[in-house]
């Protein structure tokens, strides 16, 4: 491609509404333009990158036998009503009526549509397993779109769906998809982790997320420094290796006036925060379903994990704290609640290992020191209800946990029969009887990958695209840029053009920057866009039969022969 025939839409100034590095650089480098909140145009430079991601994703989906389809973005509401998600999904689902007053939605995902397709096309167990995928735009009416294409309202996604007659078949395809995702993100040169995750609004019973590690990520992920263990902090298991020691103190109430927090009490009593406990009262129910309050107890230095706490059978979902009126009726005072309670008491593992600890005294402005389980208070059940912390033991017994921010770029689910049962999607089994299909769904944020890659790879001059194992998988819109310096002699342009033609013939994605701009402008643009290899052709260097070569990642100038240049740009 010749730059004089290509839209270079670079900007010197950083857009005022671009809030993270990737959104700033994608606009400045001329990859995208914003037309409304959460809505973007992909310019020619950016579309080249998007299409590269799509190609790699498509190749790996086809490698595991997935068949490509294309479903409409507009979906009839009755499909969503069959599964109950028309009302349950929330305001992110854009609902509208056509001119005939029929209800439709703009698809944020396609479980209902693909299940409807399977219901109409699949007849026998002999057709299974089967996997369909598409690469298509989705729409979610985000309340606050931000971070550029990272959290846009309209975005490009690869979504795949598999159908099976049994769980064993689903598990096999799930593993194949997991491996395919690993290959995709490895080919793209991303530093990523696959983590155990919650199934969320999609539903199902097994789930993994794929996260690109970046400080700007919205999710906290925990992973071992010595093994492959990784999990979303929401699900990472907390391990307590400490054993409860015998009591050495008598219990005693002490005055803690205007000290409703563990931090204030620990400082006042000159004790470690980890020797205090906090008691939270939440709404729950008896085994018979009658309303009751329950208590959850954690160490003072730990944070309640809502998702884990919701797994307590007696807790209401979503987890809801007791109201002021409910606390008052129970004779309790927020900030001073103890562990001796006339209700079920669920204690986190770490808190259950404490002895001689400090708790509330169930009396305003008082706490109790020297508290011990069994002697002074009973535990209904020991549970895992806290977030893990940096340095905690890894649950697999190998190493310690590291916690970093991650950008979710992929998510896979074993859905089971949630959608197929709701939509009566069955096939004839080997005994002739109808079998409700098992399903898996597998998503990749194609446009989000680009933002995540930039978050992980940038410097003060612009984008530095990830180093990929194969140059053909590079995300850069062009792998090589040739810059002919202005000269009175035609030799410079002729040589640059000949090199350009030769690289094209070798299959290298090359740009000839023949724009009528100063060299400094060209160099700045190429660094901003992140072209990995830059070759400068000039009178002075041609006199020595040399070319100036610069790699985007080290910017050190090298004078190389033609053969050396070709070796540089075709092997990395």
UniProtKB/Swiss-Prot annotation:
Any matching Pfam family: tRNA_edit
Subcellular location: Cytoplasm
EC numbers for this chain: 6.1.1.15
InterPro entries: aa-tRNA-synt_IIb (IPR002314), aa-tRNA-synth_II (IPR006195), aa-tRNA-synth_II/BPL/LPL (IPR045864), Anticodon-bd (IPR004154), Anticodon-bd_dom_sf (IPR036621), Pro-tRNA-ligase_IIa (IPR002316), Pro-tRNA-synth_IIa_bac-type (IPR004500), Pro-tRNA-Synthase_IIa_type1 (IPR023717)
Entry GO terms, CC: cytosol
Superkingdom, taxonomy of origin: Bacteria
Catalytic activity: tRNA(Pro) + L-proline + ATP = L-prolyl-tRNA(Pro) + AMP + diphosphate
GO molecular function: aminoacyl-tRNA deacylase activity; ATP binding; proline-tRNA ligase activity
Class of the enzyme per the UniProt entry, highest EC level: ligase
Secretion signal, residue range per the UniProt entry: none
Gene Ontology biological process terms in this record: prolyl-tRNA aminoacylation
Keywords linked to the UniProt accession: Aminoacyl-tRNA synthetase, ATP-binding, Cytoplasm, Ligase, Nucleotide-binding, Protein biosynthesis
Subunit-level organization: Homodimer.
Free-text comment about domains: Consists of three domains: the N-terminal catalytic domain, the editing domain and the C-terminal anticodon-binding domain.
Protein's job: Catalyzes the attachment of proline to tRNA(Pro) in a two-step reaction: proline is first activated by ATP to form Pro-AMP and then transferred to the acceptor end of tRNA(Pro). As ProRS can inadvertently accommodate and process non-cognate amino acids such as alanine and cysteine, to avoid such errors it has two additional distinct editing activities against alanine. One activity is designated as 'pretransfer' editing and involves the tRNA(Pro)-independent hydrolysis of activated Ala-AMP.
Sequence similarity: Belongs to the class-II aminoacyl-tRNA synthetase family. ProS type 1 subfamily.
Name of the protein described by the UniProt record: Proline--tRNA ligase
Gene source species: Psychrobacter arcticus (strain DSM 17307 / VKM B-2377 / 273-4)
Source lineage: Bacteria, Pseudomonadati, Pseudomonadota, Gammaproteobacteria, Moraxellales
């Amino acid at each position: 491609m010749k730059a004089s025939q290509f839209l270079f839409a670079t900007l010197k100034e950083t857009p005022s509404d671009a809030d993270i590095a990737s959104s700033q650089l994608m606009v400045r480098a001329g990859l995208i333009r914003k037309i409304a909140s959460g809505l973007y145009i992909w310019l020619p430079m950016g579309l080249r990158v998007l299409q590269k991601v799509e190609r790699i994703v498509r190749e790996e989906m086809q490698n595991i036998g997935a068949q490509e389809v294309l479903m409409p973005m507009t979906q009839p509401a009755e499909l969503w009503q069959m599964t109950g998600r028309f009302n349950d999904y929330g305001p992110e689902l854009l609902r509208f009526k056509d001119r005939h007053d029929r209800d439709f939605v703009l698809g944020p995902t396609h479980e209902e549509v693909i299940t409807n397709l399977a219901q109409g096309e699949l007849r026998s167990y002999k057709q299974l397993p089967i996997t369909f995928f598409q690469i298509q735009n989705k729409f979610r009416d985000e309340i606050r779109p931000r971070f550029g294409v990272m959290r846009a309202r309209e975005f490009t996604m690869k979504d795949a769906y598999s159908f099976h007659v049994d769980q064993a078949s689903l598990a096999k395809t799930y593993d194949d998809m997991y491996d395919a995702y690993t290959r995709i993100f490895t080919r793209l040169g991303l530093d990523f982790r696959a983590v155990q995750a919650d199934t969320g609004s999609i539903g199902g019973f097994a789930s993994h997320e794929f996260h690109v590690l970046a400080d700007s990520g919205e999710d906290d992920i925990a992973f071992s420094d010595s093994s492959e263990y990784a999990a979303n902090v929401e699900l990472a298991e907390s391990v307590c290796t400490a054993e409860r020691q015998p009591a050495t103190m008598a219990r005693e109430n002490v005055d803690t006036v205007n000290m409703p927090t563990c931090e204030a009490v620990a400082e006042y009593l000159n004790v470690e925060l980890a020797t205090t406990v906090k008691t939270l009262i939440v709404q729950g129910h008896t085994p018979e379903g009658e309303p009751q309050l329950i208590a959850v107890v954690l160490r003072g230095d730990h944070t309640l994990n809502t998702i884990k706490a919701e797994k307590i059978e007696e807790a209401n979902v979503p987890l809801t704290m007791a109201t002021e009126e409910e606390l008052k009726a129970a004779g309790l005072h927020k900030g001073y609640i103890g562990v001796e309670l006339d209700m079920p008491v669920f204690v986190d593992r770490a808190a259950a290992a404490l002895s001689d600890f400090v708790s509330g005294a169930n009396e305003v402005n008082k706490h109790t020191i020297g508290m011990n389980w069994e002697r002074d208070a009973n535990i209904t059940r020991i549970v895992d209800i806290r977030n893990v912390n940096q340095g905690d033991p890894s649950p697999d017994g190998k190493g310690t946990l590291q916690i970093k921010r991650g950008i979710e770029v992929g998510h896979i689910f074993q859905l089971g029969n949630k959608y197929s049962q709701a939509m009566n999607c069955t096939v004839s089994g080997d005994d002739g009887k109808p079998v409700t299909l098992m399903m898996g769904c597998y998503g990749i944020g194609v446009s989000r990958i680009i933002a995540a890659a930039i978050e992980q790879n940038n410097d003060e001059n612009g984008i530095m695209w990830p180093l990929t194992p194969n140059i053909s998988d590079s995300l850069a819109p062009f792998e090589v840029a040739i810059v002919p310096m202005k000269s009175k002699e035609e030799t410079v342009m002729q040589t640059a053009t000949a090199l350009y033609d030769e690289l094209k013939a070798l299959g290298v994605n090359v740009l000839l920057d023949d724009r009528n701009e100063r060299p400094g402008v060209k160099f700045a643009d190429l660094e901003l866009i992140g072209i990995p290899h830059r070759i400068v052709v000039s009178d002075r260097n041609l006199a020595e039969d040399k070319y100036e070569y610069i790699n985007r990642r080290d910017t050190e100038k090298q004078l190389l022969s033609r053969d050396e240049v070709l070796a540089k740009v075709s092997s990395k």
